[in-house]
Structures are given as structure tokens and as C-alpha cells.
Amino acid sequence: MFWTIFMALTDLVVPQAVVPSLRVNSKKQALQELAARAAAICGRNEREVLEVLMQRERLGSTGVGSGIAIPHGKLARLERLSGVFARLERPIDFEALDGQPVDLVFLLLAPEGAGADHLKALARIARLLRDPEIAQKLRESRDAEALYAVLAGHSTKAS
């Protein structure tokens, strides 16, 4: 499938899905804002997207550490993997594994049947965003174009 050939973060995120300075005060508010953006981009119901994300969060936080969260979920009738990236104005508590507040969030939605592709995408996103050099560039970028350029500049060949 898609991930067996090549993966760049820009294969998941269109320029309109990059939020350079999201002002939120809580994990719930962040998920609501990102769900709204993802729903608009995917042509889905905002409530449906938020519910999928909240169901996943109830299983355990998607705050992976180092100031990064990767909320994700699967949706029926979604055509392809799709994402939204946001740099938060101020770090928030995301109940991350390392207890650190989160300021970089990559929301990933996958088709219900994505299976291994969904897991591979999550692993690659985590690996790329936890790279200190990439994370620093993302934190220093102040507009959507600059953030998208950082995301576009980092890809990985499938293994």
C-alpha cells in the first residue's frame, strides 16, 4: 500500500493543515480545535473526528514525550491517511509519558482498514518529531509556510 514505497510528512499534511500558533489551554481544547481542522480538510463531521480521538485518549495519552503528542484514530470511509500539524503558543499538559508539557501536536487519521500502514505512519511520525534538530526547527518556525517547509524537508524511506 501507500507506506510501502515512501513516506514524507507532507504526504499526510496539506499546507492548509499546518497551524503555526494554536492558542489552547487544555488537552481537550487542543483536540477540539484540531478535530475541527481535520474534519474540514477530510470532509468529515467534526463531532465524529473528536469522538474517535477522545476514545483513543481514554485508552492512554498520545503524549509521547519530549513535548510531542500524536493523537490519532481510525474513521470508517476515510480514503487515506491524513494529518494536521500544530505548534502550540504555550505548552499544555497532555498527560504525556514523560510528564512534560506538549507544544508540538501531529494529529493522524487513518481509514478503518489501514492496519499496519497506520502503525508505520505513527512510528515514522514519532521518530521524525522526536529528532532534536527537527523539533527545534519546528519550535522556532513562526508561520505555516516555514513549518510546512520543515515538514517537507524531512522524509524517510520505507524499511
Pin down the residues of each PLM region:
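Cytosolic covalent-transfer regions centered on His/Cys nucleophiles
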Residues: 1-159
